[in-house]
Amino acid sequence: MHPSTVRREAERVKVSVRVRPLNERENNAPEGTKVTVAAKQAAAVVTVKVLGGSNNSGAAESMGTARRVAQDFQFDHVFWSVETPDACGATPATQADVFRTIGYPLVQHAFDGFNSCLFAYGQTGSGKTYTMMGADVSALSGEGNGVTPRICLEIFARKASVEAQGHSRWIVELGYVEVYNERVSDLLGKRKKGVKGGGEEVYVDVREHPSRGVFLEGQRLVEVGSLDDVVRLIEIGNGVRHTASTKMNDRSSRSHAIIMLLLREERTMTTKSGETIRTAGKSSRMNLVDLAGSERVAQSQVEGQQFKEATHINLSLTTLGRVIDVLADMATKGAKAQYSVAPFRDSKLTFILKDSLGGNSKTFMIATVSPSALNYEETLSTLRYASRARDIVNVAQVNEDPRARRIRELEEQMEDMRQAMAGGDPAYVSELKKKLALLESEAQKRAADLQALEREREHNQVQERLLRATEAEKSELESRAAALQEEMTATRRQADKMQALNLRLKEEQARKERELLKEMAKKDAALSKVRRRKDAEIASEREKLESTVAQLEREQREREVALDALQTHQRKLQEALESSERTAAERDQLLQQLTELQSERTQLSQVVTDRERLTRDLQRIQYEYGETELARDVALCAAQEMEARYHAAVFHLQTLLELATEWEDALRERALAERDEAAAAELDAAASTSQNARESACERLTSLEQQLRESEERAAELASQLEATAAAKSSAEQDRENTRATLEQQLRESEARAAELASQLEATAAAKMSAEQDRENTRATLEQQLRDSEERAAELASQLESTTAAKMSAEQDRESTRATLEQQLRDSEERAAELASQLESTTAAKMSAEQDRESTRATLEQQLRESEERAAELASQLESTTAAKMSAEQDRESTRATLEQQLRDSEERAAELASQLEATAAAKSSAEQDRENTRAALEQQLRDSEERAAELASQ
């Protein structure tokens, strides 16, 4: 009996279509409620109705023909999940119906050893994820569970049932990956930070092996023992899977997700000695694919990153469509097909699904569509691709090791023989027992050999992993040594930088010290300069104040002397009026003199007016052109010259008064000599008139003195103003020359007038006789004038008192000025103290800067020492690393020698096993031949027995 060949089954891809209910967006749209799809679940036919009208703004003109003709599509199964019954009146399909039709066969194929695949294809928002995962993956039971949790639940139930028989056990492993932007990410991989967006993606590479097929290198597979484990892992993967909200779907999948279930059988056999032998049995792989939905950018209105995601999704789905077209064309046309190789490698998705499409797999496809007219084009495109996929033919084979398959066949034969021995002929049973013992020994031997080979393979894999780990450790040590070398170099560079920085800090400190010393010298010089300037200003102000006080005292004394002279002269006039008489001519002369004095007073008033005008002109010039030191000097000179001219005019007036006094004395003597009462009366009148003139002159003198003080005050104000222009100087000089000329002209006129008065006084004697007639009238007038003179004397006394008060006020001003100057002196001293304190603080800052520099120097020296210590540590670590590297190389060489020896032993063992297998095959052939001979003999004996029994029965 020869071993059976590998079991292979060729069948096409099973395609199902599921029509979902209308969603909220479609119910709210004007044409959303128009259903364009009809289905007959019993006949598995989907009909796309004619789309009438032209109101659908989203329709493409290229689909016009398709809209006018209804199209029927035949599939393997149709699930109508719309609320209303289908065209045949069947009730809507549930999640349980989908599982019974698709999921249950997948579980059966998995335990039979066939690879299988289920992938959902359709537009975004058409119900793919709901069909595959359900409304809530965390819910372990309920009507809303999807195909995936139901498949896992059925796998664990079947696993428990098989393991209960005691011949084998099944191991289930789960993997979960996604294809996002043409990169494959392991959703169960160990992430450093653990959350999407905050942690790193764990990418894996897609590889292809001649015997294993397509696999993911570096993928993490987790063994699961219950549905709770599956749900937990799926929730972990969904937590890091890429999803987003679009106009078409609130939770749109932005990647293709693949759940991989790996089933491995482990068979057990007990020998006669009681030893348990474990061997590998069947294995299978199940891929549950939730494809991202195809979408039109105009409808989903995505942009930015979502636009990039939609582009990659549509490209991968387009590649999937091309693969389906090529495989379908190859299946239907054979050698006449246009393409002989499908473009699997154009996309990561199609590369992963290579075995599922046209390879070693039993594949199911479920296409999900929307019945709404809003999705007419997408629905029609999905149905066309699904219909095209039905033409793809896969050739699936059982995944089982030939030796394990042979052991399984021997076990099946032994089980058949055990059943044949029940109630049979003893001799036949004895023969069968012998053959059964031979088969059992052969099976046990093969199982032991297989177990030994598996252990040896596992040992070799362990050694290979150890070798790879050693190589990885070596490379890691080399990288660490290089990193340590770089770190030491960086430390040296840092030490050099710190040393250079220290030098720069020292230079900067020295530079700052020099700048600080220069700044301190500048401040000292500025302080000395300010102190000298303040001292000079104080001395100057003190001199000005003393000169002003002295001038005021001098003027006061002059005023007192003038007042005493006037009073003395008044008494003399009074005595002359009482003791003598004046003649009419003398009276006229005195009157004429009085008139001249009044005119002279008018002229003096004009002089004062001119001086005031000059002062105003000077003020205007100062306002227009500014003030300078030169203008102050000019103004002071002008004021001094005006004051000199004023004193000259006063002196001239006093001279005239003295002349008048002399004339009065001469008249009085003449009057005394003549003893003329009338003349005496006239003389009294003349004296009174003269007294009035003197009083007027005194008043004018006082006014002039007041104006002089005002002029002096103004001159002092002008002296305090420091800016003027050359034009002001020239104008002031010109005005001064004009004033000088005017005053000189007035002085000459006054001298001429004085000469006239002298001549008039000489003519007074001649007019004495003519004045006697008016003496009586004049006496009354003189008496009145005398009373006025007395009143004027009282006014002069009050003016004297006011002058005294002004003097006191001037003294107070002097005192206040002195206090102000003293305050300024104190302020200057305080400023000097502040500058001294600033100097002290600057010195303290300098000391602090020196301390900081010393501390910085100590810190840098400490860091330098630490860097040197670190460099020494790094050098020691480098030496130890080098020693460890050499030790690792020695270990690697010894491990390599050991592995090579083990490999040679394995090869020798394999040769022995091969020879044993050949001997076993020869013995097996001999045993089979003996068994055939025995069977033929037994059959002959059985026929003989039957003939004998027939004969006995006939007898």
Curated annotation (Swiss-Prot):
Compartments where located: Cytoplasm, Cytoskeleton
Region Disordered, residue ranges: 682-712, 725-955
Pfam families, A to Z: Kinesin (PF00225)
Keywords for the protein's UniProt record, in alphabetical order: ATP-binding, Coiled coil, Cytoplasm, Cytoskeleton, Microtubule, Motor protein, Nucleotide-binding, Repeat
Gene3D superfamilies: Kinesin motor domain
SUPFAM superfamilies: P-loop containing nucleoside triphosphate hydrolases (SSF52540)
Gene Ontology CC annotation, any one: mitotic spindle
Ligand binding (ATP): 122-129
Keyword Nucleotide-binding attributed: yes
The protein's name in its UniProt record: Kinesin-like protein K39
Protein family per UniProt: Belongs to the TRAFAC class myosin-kinesin ATPase superfamily. Kinesin family.
Record PROSITE patterns: KINESIN_MOTOR_1, KINESIN_MOTOR_2
Record GO biological process: microtubule-based movement; mitotic spindle assembly; spindle elongation
Coiled-coil intervals: 426-955
Domain of life: Eukaryota
GO MF terms, alphabetically ordered: ATP binding; microtubule binding; plus-end-directed microtubule motor activity
Sequence repeat locations: 704-742, 743-781, 782-820, 821-859, 860-898, 899-937, 938-955
Basic and acidic residues compositional bias, start-end: 785-794, 824-833, 863-872, 902-911, 941-955
Renumbered residue ranges of the record's region 7 X 39 AA approximate tandem repeats: 704-955
Domain Kinesin motor: 12-392
Native organism taxonomy: Eukaryota, Discoba, Euglenozoa, Kinetoplastea, Metakinetoplastina
Main location: cytoplasm
